[in-house]
Amino acid sequence: MATFGFLSAPLKSTNEVDLVKPLTSYIDNVYNTSDNNRSDVAEAVQELNKLRSKACCQPLDKHQSALDVLTRYYDQLVAIENKIIISATQNPVVFKWKDAFDKGSLFSSRASLSLSDGSFERAAVLFNIGSLMSQIGAAQQFHTDDEIKVSAKLFQQSAGVFARLRDVVLGMVQQEPTPDLMPDTLAALSALMTAQAQEAIYIKGHKDKMKATSMVKISAQVAEFYSEAQKMMSKDIVRGLWDKDWSAIVSGKNLAYQALAQYHQSEVCGEARQIGEQLSRLAESLKLFDTAQKYLPRDITGIWDIYPSVSKAHAAAKKDNDFIYHEKVSDFRTLPTLPKAVLAKPTPMQTPMTPSFRDMFAVLVPVQVHNAMQSYDARKAELVNMETVRMREATQLMNGVLASLNLPAALDDVTSTETLPESLKLKSAKLKQNGGSSEIMRLFSELPTLYQRNEDILTETSRILNEEKESDDTMRKQLGTKWTRMSSEQLTGPLVTEIGKYRGILHTASNADKMVKEKFESHRQGIELLSKNESELRSSIPGQTAHATGETDTVRQLRQFMSQWNEVTTDRELLEKELKNTNCDIANDFLKAMAENQLINEEHISKEKIAQIFGDLKRRVQSSLDTQETLMNQIQAANNTFTGEKTGSSTGAERERILKMLAQASDAYVELKANLEEGTKFYNDLTPILVRLQQKVSDFAFARQTEKEDLMRQLQLSIVSGQAAKAVVDGVNSLVSSYLTGGTNAAQSPANAPPRPPPPRPAAPSVESPIPPPRTQQSMQATPGAPPQYNPYQQQQQPQMQQFQQHPGYYQQPMPYGQPQPMFQPQYQPTFAAPYPTFPGAFPSYQQQWPQQQQQGGFPPNPQFGQQNQQQGGGGGANPFQ
């Protein structure tokens, strides 16, 4: 089976990352999804988390199915790029990717980069897509045409992926990327994959036995592509990344395909009977093949199998020329350059890369569209609030005027002698139906608790940010320039601004609460009177004498005006509801604008849409205000006439004052209750917003803590690696110096070492057994830690034995006094003539001779070495048996 030595880029590796919590939190904070959509989004987040684990953390087979998983994950990342922002400030998720080419070392781990950025994740996944494409292409068997076509296609797609990544990587990775993601590295990989794609096309042509003219162009272009790849791979910035085999194979294939191009051109020359040029090109081909042997391994049989054909063709052509043609061999330098044909090109990358891709987050709109929709909602809310406030202020103004005129209570006084006017009965009943003064007091009592709850959330949020900043400042102060991550001030600016914004909102709300409280105190007496039962309310109002006038035309006219005013207030309530409930789906307009221009002119689109759907409502509001203006003038004119008619009335000034106060209190109650309910709703609505802000800050602090721990771990590893490397270097230097010192002493020791003693003479056979040694001495010797008994005779015979104890068979190794030696001992061979061991080293604790041995001199003492040197302060000695 022919092999072609195709190269494939390695995959980047990463760690497991939990996407569920941060993505769910971000979606809840940003998007107001319905209950049905919320369940769909939660399911999509879970599916995305599983997809990442499968695509990035599990082993990938060199198969199209594994590539489909990677491309699907990448397409999903692109789809949510504008929907779910992942950044260090908005939605921090730490992605850690290791360098694909760095294998690490004994003292350091693989180079890696950790960033809280979704674009960094996309860049790493895109690199792995290009790498896996190259691996699948290189793994083809090249037995069939389909396999060759698949290989050429995948190599071109891989080249396109690396080329695209080269152009955009610096914009996707905000910090300096790892070496595998540097533009020069990606350019070299793209050039290499393009060369291999052209080579696959050459293999297809060679298999199909294409014409020599075509093979010349294809092979010459293969050599050209490999030459470009070799130049890019030889740059200083990327030269250290590649394995030695890579550089050798690329250089070898550059030469080999130059040789093949010359060989195929020689075939063309042979067909044209250009023997001189044919011989020159064949000789150059052989020369190039000989040079390629220095780089290209012999196991790449797909190329080396052609080499015998070149050699054979050269021999045949030379023979024919020598015997038949006798043409002069052309000078190769004068020959024209070979034509080239570019058949392989990097395939432009298209998204989505997965056929029939389906976005799991289709219910979410891009953040730009979402922001535009929020701006539209803000404009719409501003319009609704403005029109509502205009109507409410006008209503309050009208009610104030009527209360100052004591209308409609004054009309009841002229037609009835009842102390409590009918209009006040209705107002009191309505006020008590709404809860009366107790309801107002209850709402007031809840506001401080609601305010304090939101204030506590903001305080805790600020505390989390401050603690994170203090921790970062402490580490930066301790480690200085080694602490390379971004400072907290650079990242927390938007969060601090948001906290300040909500503090300002709370302060404004607190001031509004005080104003409402003051207004309540000014109308408290009237509200409390209206909250009493009818008899108590009647007793608090001064009575009146018989009325002076009856149902006059002026009274009837005023009653008609009051009825018209009631109709106006009823219409305004309906108008307020219509303003609040008017909605439209403007998302399609924004999506269309974004698809056409990649930009959204939100102001123009929003204003045009608002004018379209709110134009008629605004006209009705203005008509209501105009009607009120006319009606107010008519009421004031009629009231002047009415006041003149009732001049002789017996109604006292105190009664009129009380009736006016109660009328104003009734109107104030409605406003106060609405204000307090609105304030309660405001605080309750603000709480989840602040909780989401607190969660966002907590996620940011957690991500920063994870980043901090990872950076500290890397710093510790670098410190430990540096210490370990220093220790190894010091150890090697120590060994080298000790070896040199020992070698010098060993060279001097033979002159000072004692001569080797003669071998022992065998003892004469004896009928009687030798006298055993004393039992006392044996018992002492049997105790490992016991010192030998004092023997002056032995000390005289062996004064040097006390220098140090040595292990038998091992030299230059002093042993500690009185300790057993667990080393190997010579095997005991018993004899009938020696019931006790009588050879040196039999008792390892102490090297002594028995008295009979000393007398007979049958055994020599243990060899002593370096004694003179030791006594003279010299170094270690050499082995005396050398």
Curated annotation (Swiss-Prot):
Compositional bias segments (type: Low complexity): 791-830, 847-871
Domain of life (superkingdom): Eukaryota
Pfam families: ALIX_LYPXL_bnd, BRO1
Annotated region (Disordered), positions in chain: 743-882
GO cellular component terms, semicolon-separated: basolateral plasma membrane; cytoplasmic vesicle; endosome; multivesicular body; organelle; recycling endosome
Biased composition (Pro residues): 752-763
Disulfides per UniProt: none
Classification via SMART domains: BRO1
Gene Ontology molecular function terms on file: Notch binding
Feature: compositional bias, Gly residues: 872-882
BRO1 domain segment(s): 5-398
GO annotation (BP), single: endosome organization
PROSITE patterns associated with the record: BRO1
Chain's role: Required for lin-12 degradation after it has been internalised in the vulval precursor cells.
Name of the protein described by the UniProt record: Apoptosis-linked gene 2-interacting protein X 1
The species this protein was found in: Caenorhabditis elegans
Lineage, highest ranks first: Eukaryota, Metazoa, Ecdysozoa, Nematoda, Chromadorea
Gene name as annotated: alx-1
